[in-house]
């Protein structure tokens, strides 16, 4: 029904937001490691 569609939509958005947040934290960790290597 409609609620199932809404639930799927929210789940999909949450999944992609979570992926994006994870990618951003990975990038932040990588830049932190790179900074440590330089010093």
Swiss-Prot record:
Disulfide bonds: none annotated. InterPro entries: Alpha_enterocin/lactococcin. GO terms for biological process: defense response to bacterium; killing of cells of another organism. Signal peptide: none annotated. Keywords: Antibiotic, Antimicrobial, Bacteriocin. Bacteriocin activity requires interaction of alpha and beta peptides in a molar ratio of 7:1 or 8:1 respectively. Kills Lactococci. This is Bacteriocin lactococcin-G subunit alpha. It comes from Lactococcus lactis subsp. lactis (Streptococcus lactis).
């Amino acid at each position: 029904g409609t609620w199932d569609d809404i639930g799927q939509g929210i789940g999909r958005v949450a999944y992609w937001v979570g992926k994006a947040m994870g990618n951003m934290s990975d990038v932040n960790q990588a830049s932190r490691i790179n900074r440590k290597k330089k010093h």
